[in-house]
Amino acid sequence: MAVNPLLTPTGQQTIPLIPSPFGPPTVDRDVLPSTVAPTDPRQFCVPSQFGSSVLPNTNMANVLSSRIYPGWGILPPESIKAVARRNEMIQRHHTARTEMEMYAIYQQRRMEKINPKGLAGLGIPFLYGSSVPAAPAAYHGRSMLPAGDLHFHRSTLRNLQGNPMLAATAPHFEESWGQRCRRLRKNTGNQKALDSDAESSKSQAEEKILGQTHAVPYEEDHYAKDPDIEAPSNQKSSETNEKPTTALANTCGELEPTHRKPWGSHTTTLKAKAWDDGKEEASEQIFATCDEKNGVCPPVPRPSLPGTHALVTIGGNLSLDEDIQKWTVDDVHSFIRSLPGCSDYAQVFKDHAIDGETLPLLTEEHLRGTMGLKLGPALKIQSQVSQHVGSMFYKKTLSFPIRQAFDQPADTSPLLDPNSWSDTMNIFCPQDTIIPKGIERGSMRN
């Protein structure tokens, strides 16, 4: 029979034993009732600061709930460093989520300030994708976009500006853009100018577009000094009207503004100087017979950019008008050999049997790792091929949106005003994609 250690044997003086302060208190099995005492002699000791010791038995639910505090268990306690690291990670997640929500609210307020209907009123297709209709009805009449649609990564805008394949592959971009712009212009009419913040951002956007314009200075001055293209008296500023119009026209292949000076039946020759020596001159017919019904000429391909002179004529058998996918291995060899600084690697392309179908698929890793090219020639070849492919897609998709571009009469409002977009924005430029001013401001601030 077990003896209580707190009691002495019969006949001796009872002296209570003081438990050690350094060890956990224990409870004898005979002190507890039979319903509580477990069959296993092992005991589960709890330090005194968490209550008296109890035993792990299935019949002790009430005892455990009143004696043991949350967080106490049989597992070893977690280290302080791990707890601090976990708390810091959770705090970072909460902070990042809060910043994203605040930025979304800020973007919404700014879009509402520029356009009361929000971006859904503009109906920009690439915000939602080709599968979702670009209309406010898609969101059941809500006047603003969800918070997730306001986060545009900067690389997305760069790809839209620099890679024409993203927007040229789907004709839905040109169709819905032109229809929504014309509808927006009819509904809004003559609206008041925006506040000073919007005007300052407009001037910044004008300077950026003018800086990117690859125009001949003489033609730009000629458009500015022509008395027939004076801004109407009801416009707020002639400078705000003239410069963006000229910049957009010159950027999109030296195309004159459709709403300022109707063209007659004539042809014009543009002379482009070669980039390397400045002596060669290649003349192109850029305007054909104009449409006498509405006095508008169809737009023409842009002149070659600096550095693309090798794409104009290569050995007399390759030109910009030819499809790059039809090139043979010898054509690719001639193309690489004609590029300045890349003639030494032309034989490498021929040894690897690179033709017109595989040339656009080459990446920098292929050129440098597999074919052994240096960084400069590899980047130059990639740039020339991308410009060639972009001009090819541009010419293929040019004829389709132009028929809708001139269905409506032209407007005399500024091109950069989001309340009255001009029809000339239907003309798709591969290198200079026009985007709304609100998104442009967001990308410039980022």
From Swiss-Prot:
Subcellular location: Nucleus; Cytoplasm
Chain positions covered by the region annotation Disordered: 187-207, 225-277
Tissue expression as described in the entry: Expressed in the retina (at protein level). Expressed in the retinal inner and outer nuclear layers.
Skewed-composition ranges (Polar residues): 232-249
InterPro entries attached to this UniProt entry: PcG_chromatin_remod_factors (IPR050548), SAM (IPR001660), SAM/pointed_sf (IPR013761)
Pfam families to which the protein is assigned, alphabetical: SAM_1
The entry's keywords: Cytoplasm, Nucleus
PANTHER family: POLYCOMB GROUP PROTEIN, STERILE ALPHA MOTIF DOMAIN-CONTAINING PROTEIN 7
Disease affiliated with this protein: Macular dystrophy with or without cone dysfunction: A form of macular dystrophy, a retinal disease in which various forms of deposits, pigmentary changes, and atrophic lesions are observed in the macula lutea. MDCD is a progressive, autosomal recessive form characterized by reduced visual acuity and macular atrophy involving the fovea. Some patients also exhibit mild generalized cone dysfunction.
Name of the protein in its database record: Sterile alpha motif domain-containing protein 7
Organism: Homo sapiens (Human)
Lineage: Eukaryota, Metazoa, Chordata, Craniata, Vertebrata
